[in-house]
Amino acid sequence: MFSRLIHIVQSFSKVERLLFYGALVIFIVSGAILAIEATDEYTYKKPLPGGRYSEGFVGQLTAINPILTNNDIDRTISKLLFETLDALSESIKDDGKRVWTVRLKDNVLWHDGEMITSDDVVFTIQTIQNPNAFSPLFTTWQGVVAERVSEKEVRLTIRTPYVFFNDNLKDLPIIPKHIFDHIPPTNLRLSEYSIEAIGSGPYKFDSYQKRKDGFITKYTLALNDHYYGNAPLIHFVDFKFYSSLEDLVVGFNAGEISGFGTFDPRITKEISRSHVVYSLLLPQYYALFLNQNSSLPLKEKNVRLALDYAIDRKRIIDEVFLGHAITVSGPLVPGSSGYSPSVNVPKEYNPTKAHTILESSGWKPNSDHRGIRTRRLGDAIVLLEFTITTPDTPLLVKTAQIIRENLEAVGSKVTLDIVSIDSINKDIIPSRNYQITLFGNITGRQPDFFSFWHSSQRFYPGLNLALYQNKSADNLIESIRQNSDPEKRQSDLTTLQSAIIQDYPVLFLYAPHYIHITEPRIKGFDAKWVLTPAYKFDTIKSWYINTTRALR
């Protein structure tokens, strides 16, 4: 049959052969197109279990124990290894005031096969409350009494009503008592279980690699075969560690890792391989916190108002963050729970108005001081000068440089004090030894303003970095924490935001986006908003690499 067809074609004239072959090509191409369309119409790509994802980090893990984590690396890995009380609970009920009862799910196991019980919950809370454990959660859990009711039930009692306690309870990560019970709290970070962790999450510890100098280069997780819930599709997750962001990007370009995260969008210009960029919003903002106790000019509200008008936030967002940030007008990020658009009016860049306010307030350019504005206060001539203290990170240093330029343009003198992150956290912030500090606040899931804005938190370990004092604001903060009526609580939140904004204790700047970068083959990532960078892995159960086709 085939040889006869060839014989027939050979008998064609040259023109007939061209027409025949043209028709044949059209037939084959049309058939292929129809086949593809039919495949797309009657089948779909279905995620398939398997594959390996590798996340890159700059730095090192220190303790994979969720009640001890104080950095994004430890928090990220811990979230995949340990479950929260919300995930482990069948029910969480409260009496509407001060008592919560938690019922754990049946047959939920630790990675080593041991049963999770109420003893683990009580042990976790009591360990956090032990000052020798140095848990970052210590303050949050003071005054909470945890009692074992039965093997699967726990009762928790708080001293005073607190409407946000339910969220604290749900977010509480649980650690195994049978692993840590015999380890002194001071040694928890040194325990081998802070590396070779035993948790209850969808992934379990598999292995790690380190250099001779002790630097851990790779930490691997595998699917938890005891997991009680829907398992992720990706079977292995590697965390690879680099000494610098530059080395990490080289690793990504070389295919060593599948993805990484950063707050610095400028790094995308250094990527040479195909990639996908996700820009995620967080409840985190940066601002200039003003210490009025250390600067006479800052005590004047009109000076603070003028400085606010002088700052070009759009320029900061465009030049420093390449547009991957939004302006912030108050103590909550847009989209956060409790945010009130009506009082968070967008900040106006108006250096002319800043000049006018300073002039009308008596701050005049002084030729004896190179044109810097001065004002007589009592017997002294006071210069309009400030020192801005900022951590030594590229994004914040660049931000501070733009702000210095803005403020000097309206007649002030600005000195930048650039210090290490370690010095900021251990010395500068605890002592409040700054005039102005460029720093960030993570506001969290719920709008609890107490740590950041209540006057009792003006000094360490409180986080009221502006040393803000306002009795009305204190009363509102206390009311918000205790009032279970959502309408009244939102009304108080709106009033509180308005009060803080109008007092100008802080010059609010921007909320940066968190940039998540992956290979195109990593599918299923759909997060738009995350509480912290570690929370991007909350959606890992929907991530996939391998696919197959299935009938619709």
Model-derived regions: residue spans:
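Ligand/substrate-recognition segments at binding pockets and active sites
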Residues: 26, 214-217, 364-443, 514
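Surface-exposed binding/hinge segments that line
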Residues: 33, 137-185
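Detector for C-terminal structural segments
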Residues: 36, 310-344, 395-404, 427-552
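N-terminal lobe/hinge region of extracytoplasmic solute-binding protein
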Residues: 56-104, 126, 198
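Aromatic- and charge-enriched surface segment that lines or borders ligand/interaction sites
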Residues: 91-134, 155-157, 251, 297-299
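Gly/Pro-rich hinge or "lid" segments in bacterial periplasmic/extracellular proteins
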Residues: 172-236, 246, 351-360, 545-552
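Append "and occasionally in soluble cytosolic enzymes with long acidic Gly/Pro-rich linkers
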Residues: 218-222, 299-405, 495, 549
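Ligand-site clamp/hinge motif
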Residues: 224-270, 404, 413-415
